[in-house]
UniProtKB/Swiss-Prot annotation:
Keywords: Developmental protein, Differentiation, Disulfide bond, Glycoprotein, Secreted, Signal, Wnt signaling pathway. The gene is Frzb. Residues 299-323 are annotated as: Disordered. The keyword Nuclease does not apply. The FZ domain is involved in binding with Wnt ligands. Residues 178-298 form the NTR domain. Soluble frizzled-related proteins (sFRPS) function as modulators of Wnt signaling through direct interaction with Wnts. They have a role in regulating cell growth and differentiation in specific cell types. SFRP3/FRZB appears to be involved in limb skeletogenesis. Antagonist of Wnt8 signaling. Regulates chondrocyte maturation and long bone development. InterPro entries: Frizzled/SFRP, Frizzled_dom, Frizzled_dom_sf, Netrin_domain, Netrin_module_non-TIMP, NTR_Sfrp3, SFRP3_CRD, TIMP-like_OB-fold. This is Secreted frizzled-related protein 3. Interacts with MYOC.
Length: 323
């Protein structure tokens, strides 16, 4: 190929530019970059494994994106928003599919706004502001353009069997039934289990798959919170099995006590959690119990707290945000 060979050194700058353009058109590798595996460590837990460079921040390689994302490690360590990691990875390692190879898919505006709402107060505390490069205004709205959000991604964890709402098990998948051991809300239980969160919430929906059960609740009041940010909004409570324990009924209001998955910024509803029908009297009791627990400095609950940390994979030493 003449144009890509050594060539003659007597060409002017204009000739060189034309020559370079012709070369690029003839070299297959010069076409739009194809999808490539995600190699950014922070983003490997996300529900996509292919990305495309340059990303939305104009980084030409993932190596550059890795260096740029390091500035957010401290902020991610505060768990200020369950949407922050998803949003950052959607910007720094955008999802790439066969249908959308020409241009990376952007995160939805609502995802950015939720992340900013949860984390900007911490940035301000350390005399920083939300980065202009991550501005939400220019991002697409879900129903008006192509964008991604955590709610829009469906994972294929196996067959989707119908659920018998009266018994709480799958039909056709297994004969094994869910047996939930009831846990009563008492001061002794509250001290022993040392729950990460306590909320007053109304159950909006229970999404049931045989291997994936999620309760969607509307948070009315936050009685206790730990590392995972809890918005006064609709949130998901995740299980770690195919059973909803404790059981919940749609449209009922409960006081819910549970744990958190710190690494994935999720609230958990697992065996040992409590869900009792809401009563003002019970809410007042919980507040008194929590005050006593704080006054005792966790006292005798340290050992049980350590055990629960190991069970739920929580880290009791969050990293502060970088100043």
């Amino acid at each position: 190929m003449v144009c890509c060979g050594p060539g003659r050194m007597l060409l002017g700058w204009a000739g060189l530019l034309v020559l370079a353009a012709l070369c690029l058109l003839q070299v297959p590798g010069a076409q739009a970059a194809a999808c490539e595996p995600v190699r950014i460590p922070l983003c490997k837990s996300l529900p996509w494994n292919m990305t495309k460079m340059p990303n939305h921040l104009h980084h030409s390689t993932q190596a550059n994106a890795i260096l740029a994302m390091e500035q957010f490690e401290g902020l991610l360590g505060t768990h200020c928003s369950p949407d922050l990691l998803f949003f950052l990875c959607a910007m720094y390692a955008p999802i790439c599919t066969i249908d959308f190879q020409h241009e990376p898919i952007k995160p939805c505006k609502s995802v950015c706004e939720r992340a900013r709402q949860g984390c900007e107060p911490i940035l301000i505390k350390y005399r920083h502001s939300w980065p202009e490069s991550l501005a939400c205004d220019e991002l697409p709205v879900y129903d008006r353009g192509v964008c991604i959000s955590p709610e829009a991604i469906v994972t294929a964890d196996g067959a989707d069997f119908p659920m018998d709402s009266s018994t709480g098990h799958c039909r056709g998948a297994s004969s094994e039934r869910c047996k939930c051991k009831p846990v009563r809300a008492t001061q002794k239980t509250y001290f022993r289990n040392n729950y990460n969160y306590v909320i007053r919430a109304k159950v909006k929906e229970v999404k049931m798959k045989c291997h994936d059960v999620t309760a969607v609740v509307e948070v009315k009041e936050i009685l206790k919170a730990s590392l995972v940010n809890i918005p006064r909004d609709t949130v998901n409570l995740y299980t770690t099995s195919g059973c909803l324990c404790p059981p919940l009924t749609v449209n009922e209001e409960y006081v819910i006590m549970g744990y958190e998955d710190e690494e994935r910024s999720r609230l958990l509803l697992v065996e040992g959690s409590i869900a009792e029908k809401w009563k003002d009297r019970l809410g007042k009791k919980v507040k008194r119990w929590d005050m006593k627990l704080r006054h005792l400095g966790l006292g005798k609950t340290d050992a049980s707290d350590s055990t629960q940390n190991q069970k739920s994979g929580r880290n009791s030493n969050p990293r502060p945000a970088r100043s």
